[in-house]
A protein has these predicted regions:
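Catalytic Walker B motif of ABC-type/P-loop ATPase nucleotide-binding domains
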Residues: 163-167
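Conserved ABC ATPase "signature" region
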Residues: 101, 116-134, 159
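Conserved structural motif at the start of ABC-family nucleotide-binding domains
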Residues: 6, 21-23
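Helix-to-loop junction immediately C-terminal to a conserved catalytic motif
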Residues: 52
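Conserved ABC ATPase signature
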Residues: 113, 138-142, 146
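Conserved ABC transporter NBD signature motif
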Residues: 60-68
Length: 168
């Protein structure tokens, strides 16, 4: 039996006990790009949150590297999968570099102390996302488009196998 990087089996998604969609079958191979297209309210964001483990499935299974997503610890899941949502809470007195560096938390331990390699991973991710010039700027004082680039950098520097991007 072939294992996919990410797979769903008879997945049902939604909030509470009301499914937005059910019977979802998705399979993704390494390097593959999948795009979800649909109208507002169709459940695209809900599906991404369920794939990331932020929402529990209402039915079915999410597999990551052939293993049920619920079997992963939060840290192990974060090392394999990153979710970028379009809106995030504003933080006080946080530079864009520091905000992006939160993507390294799965690797830094509880104290969150960045090694030189972690700092380089953050810098590289900011460059890939076109946000290196924002590194020293306050995250609250940049445009929405710039904020999206920093959010993307945070997801990239997490170095996951799976990137889930909601309205990148």
């Amino acid at each position: 039996m072939r294992e996919f990087l990410c797979e769903t089996q008879e997945l049902a998604i939604g909030y509470g006990k009301t499914p937005l969609a059910s019977g979802i079958a998705l399979r993704a191979n390494p390097g593959q790009i999948l795009v979800l297209v649909g109208p507002n309210g169709a459940g695209k964001s809900t599906l991404l949150k369920t794939l990331a483990g932020q929402l529990a499935p209402l039915g079915g299974t999410v597999l990551l590297d052939g293993q049920d997503l619920t079997a992963y610890t939060g840290t192990a899941r974060a090392q394999k999968l990153a979710l970028m949502l379009p809106h995030t809470r504003r933080t006080e007195l946080t530079t864009c570099f520091e905000f992006a560096a939160a993507g390294r938390i799965p690797y830094t331990g509880r104290l969150g102390i960045l090694s030189d390699a972690d700092r380089q991973a953050v810098q590289d991710a900011l460059e890939i996302a076109g946000a290196a010039h924002l590194a020293d700027r306050d995250f609250n004082c940049i445009s929405d488009g710039q904020r999206q680039r920093v959010l993307l950098a945070r997801a990239i520097c997490q170095q996951p196998k799976v990137l889930l991007l909601d309205e990148p």
